[in-house]
């Protein structure tokens, strides 16, 4: 909540019915303040009083801001347009607002900022945070704002700012520039100087170049902020031609500077730019010319002056320029036109019209031309022509070919002998165009620029090794590579003295290398020629042909000359082209090691190929050498749990398969990708129709025995075990279109079409006729990226979490995340928090620019930040956030007691011992209390999970794809449509219960509507939804899922079914066969597993045959186990997962030696009821088993003092043997504080950004909701120069 909203709260309101107050707006009596927030407006409304001083238009759908909408407001001082969809702002928009002092355009879609005024204006505060801004031109933006005090450009896409942007701003005291991908070259020197003069909220960090990444701009040495001096290539007559040698890749656009100001070829006479070459007048002082490059292409908005355009003939808004590209590269050209009626665009190459094809693809209404690969025959003159009924325009430009030369090493490293303790320098120099990059490796392992005693020079040409040891003896390889090839050279280091180092792998001498190369040439040259002919003639008909092509795209000279880039591009192109043509790959032939490069390519060169491609296998491998620590405690990412196979169960690794995947092409495309394809004679049904006809229910039946806590604990456990990583982009890789604006299957978009009879289409609530869906990200090494792992494999998906039940949802799945959650101010081993409840108990800390999933429901009036937790989904719904809060409180409660009992323990020991106890609590509650309930009894659980027989290191605990994507999602069938909120009297609180869709991503309601107690009581004192086959998912999940965050609300059933197809899960019947269950061949056979004939008829109408039923659908409709919540198929998959998760965990709480017998005795006392009693604010009544529902009357619930409590005395002086490395961990812990995002004034809570009056008040105290302030956590002085500046 910002200053404007706070001020508005101070005055009386009347509804918008009088003159000067538009409909849907609220105004004060004099019309000075007008609030049109949340009104669904698409433009500024008419009828606003000319006396208006403050105009608030937050949370609307305004997409264009034009001057005519702002005429007639001569007294307007504050304009708030946050949370709209503004993409276009007309030039000089403030010319009609002579008194405007505050302008907020945050949380919009702006990419380019035009000139805002043509004459001086008294603007004091400008907020542009959280847009998509990539370019700001100082010549217009800030030229007329001498009174500007504050500017916020944070959370945009700005790489650099022009050098004069902040000149002539004498009043500027606050500039927020963080959360931008800064390119730290000479262009940020002015930014650095500015940051030293003004105040800022958070530091701005470099993103590029790599060697400066994560360094704060204001702390970088100025000598490192470099631009390159160009080389003089030639001069003719009155012109110089200069070449920027810094640009090593055509994918990085060159930026030219003259006298430290960027050169713009569209506005400076006499300059001509072609890629990395600039032609300048001879009178130019070339000593003042420098160059650098952007790391991502800055779009055409960089030099576009946007304006409002009415009906008329076509007019170019962006014209493509002449350019040059390297052979084999991808070319993307934008030609953008506006006009009404909408113009049609036609393309010509050398005067000949062409249509979209695989080689030359046209997208986005023909606005975008893509050419891949760009070859000599593609060069020439291109014309973009736009026509409508009112006229025609055309523009012609050239695309030229740049010659490329593969690297040639002219000075290679020489073998050398050196004494122990000495120093050696290997030199490697190569020529090529583009300039080669260098990669050094030692016995197959890549050497970083600085790695211990190894150091690579800045240009990569030298490798220096100091203080040589015997283990450094071996072969060193230098590979020089550019986009068109690579070459390598090897040298041997012999270390004199000490014992002879035994090589782990046999070494190949020069004679053997020559023999291998000769044989390889004989075998490969003829095979390559043959396969190229097959490629040209489209004769690839089976997997073996494809495998031969993969192998023979390797280089002719296997040792001396390795064209790594050619291998990669040729192979990927081959996969893409022939899979697109319909090639079917047999899974049995593809997995696991059937297409190896190693027979013709040295392992060091394979390593180099992987490095150059940028593709790595998830986690960096921990050597697990810290045996003291790893014997006592878990790592955060799961590594070193299994000493024999340390990557088992680790985060950021592929999900495990129970059955081979089913992809339409056998490789990577999901079932349903190709429209109309038949399976067993029938097309697969539209998943939305399955949801509507079979899964959705408007009525629910309460469970007679179980409480809603069963559902909530299941979700909490799931978020400790599984989180499938989805595609990073919402844009189609092929066309660049947003996934929510296309219904075509274009990676990563796999959207679900809506039928004409769909209620969303009929009601016109769907802006686009499909539900948005992005595919899960593929693990590098599968699908398209598999080639750099020396084999072709089918697509696999990644689990971002550890597969162990280890409380990673409390502590995080990596060490960086864990440090974010710790209180490192005090050496007390506690978790961090920012505010407390009225009972003095901690709430979750607020996130601060983290990766928490927080699609905020910003229609609410209390926009606090989201909570931070070990799992990024903690804000997903209110009851989940309350459960997370319980465990933060329990950790800190235990940590305080351990500290009191063991005064000699430091914070690191307290933290890890407490974390170990919390993990054991989760394991005990899950296996002893929760799993027997969902399986329908201990006997059923023992049948499917089995009893614990001890740790088995041969077991892989990794989560299975079927478990994460289908089986464990049975929990969606037991979710109530309402979150109950009950007070101490077990009646509804005054704010009432809350519909589920209103509980999504609304963490502010935890703080403002009763805290966590009502939510927790609503879980253990309300009945679970019964998962009846005819009542599966409630309508809150089918029609209103995350409806505030999406233009088309999601459908959870649709997500589940589509995700299982995306992951290639086989059908329901195949998993029944895997589980040794009877497999239905006909619909009549289904009656043994599904009792309701109507459900069988619906399945038959949707799927045609039983063999087509999706796993999740079949699993939720089959007959349940007696007293259980799922049927035998899901019981098989879930039981297998929990059994392996337990038996393959070296730190399982029941394993001998993990806890002492005395400690185990106490852990067995743990119940979730006790945790709720200890950590709720005022929970004093509860049933002993919170998963059972005793009824709604208060008398059915016993007192907390009657529940058994764990005695922590068993941990007194238990763990004094501290590992030495734990002291290092304390020192490495990042010292971070907790900033409160708000303040307290006269006992009243003021949210972040609110202005307080009278002047000189300070934000000094923590706000304790529902009680007076408790402690001082923040002091913020308000200087006189700040009082008129506002943070929105």
UniProtKB/Swiss-Prot annotation:
Binds 1 Ca(2+) ion per subunit. Binds 1 heme b (iron(II)-protoporphyrin IX) group covalently per subunit. Glycans are attached at residues 247, 594, 740, 857. Its EC number is 1.11.2.-. Keywords: Calcium, Coiled coil, Disulfide bond, Extracellular matrix, Glycoprotein, Heme, Hydrogen peroxide, Immunoglobulin domain, Iron, Leucine-rich repeat, Metal-binding, Oxidoreductase, Peroxidase, Repeat, Secreted, Signal. One of its GO terms (molecular function) is heme binding. Residues 304-323 are annotated as: Disordered. It is an enzyme of class 1 (oxidoreductase). Residues 17-51 form the LRRNT domain. GO terms for cellular component: extracellular space. LRR repeats lie at residues 27-49, 50-72, 73-96, 97-120, 122-143, 145-168, 204-227, 356-381, 387-412, 998-1022, 1049-1073, 1168-1189. PANTHER family: OXIDASE/PEROXIDASE, PEROXIDASIN. This is Peroxidasin homolog. It comes from Caenorhabditis briggsae.
